[in-house]
Amino acid sequence: MFTLVSCNTSKNANTNLPKDISERPADEDSQKYEQAQLDKLKASIQSEVSKEKCTAASEWTFAPMGAKACGGPQQYIAYPKKIETIILPRIEEYTQKVKAFNEKYNITSDCMMVMPPTSVKCINGKAQLITAEQ
């Protein structure tokens, strides 16, 4: 004996599917994963900048990067002006993702204000940010 089933059989096949990721609660694993993604993006930005040799400080500038939970940047990063159109959108992407991460996971920070550097100096081929205290 055989049972024939047609294509019009109405059976709900979606009952055991996992929930959409956006409906899942934030847990420790997803926070660790997102932090790892942020770390990877930050490292790729720093790697892109470090490929460039610093020979003339006038060819370099700096930008705020990241976001503290209570406001302000996490740090400043020096970059060569010649890659500004490539690097600034990536720095902004990282900063926005850090802000979203901070809000999503209720991250707290030390709220210490990171002062902007006053200039960039080339030391042994590497760009160094100079602050008022130096």
What is the role of each PLM region?
Residues 8-10:
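Bacterial signal peptide processing site
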Residues 32-71:
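Extracytoplasmic/periplasm-facing segments of secreted or lipoprotein envelope proteins
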Residues 123-134:
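Short, low-complexity, Pro/Ser/Thr/Gly-rich segments in the mature regions of secreted, periplasmic
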Residues 16-35:
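Post-signal peptide N-terminal segment of mature Sec-exported envelope proteins
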Residues 3-6:
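C-terminal motif of bacterial Sec signal peptides marking the signal peptidase cleavage site
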Residues 86-119:
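Functional cores of ribonucleases/endoribonucleases
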Residues 55, 59-99:
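Mature extracytoplasmic domains of secretory-pathway proteins
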Residues 60, 120-122:
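A structural signal for short hydrophobic beta-strand segments in well-ordered beta-sheet cores
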